Amino acid sequence: DVAKALGNPSKAKTIVFSMKVFDLAHLILKDEYLNFPEDIPIPVDYHVRNVAISSGIVDKYAGDDDVRRAWMSVLSEVNSRISRRVNLLRIDSVVWQVGKVMYKNNFAIRSLIFICLL
């Protein structure tokens, strides 16, 4: 509905991010995440894109849809290994933080290794 009202595709970063903010507000008020479908797209931004490339889940940047598909594959693997189902908004939260630290440290591999050890 938000996407239609704004005339944007539902996978647009602004639309997905607004859903994420709504989800976080709901978490603060109700102490639980909203039940979004697993196929909700990840909001692709600079950090999410660069972690996808740096991690090797995409060979090279050919568009945001490739990045979304790669993170969807990661989500499928995560959900096959844990007892609880998560969606890409949960993965985005972690990926974005990793990407931010990588950027602050000029993508130094030592910074990424340090984060992974935390």
Protein language model features and the residues they cover:
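C-terminal accessory module of base-excision DNA glycosylases/AP lyases that mediates lesion recognition
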Residues: 1-118
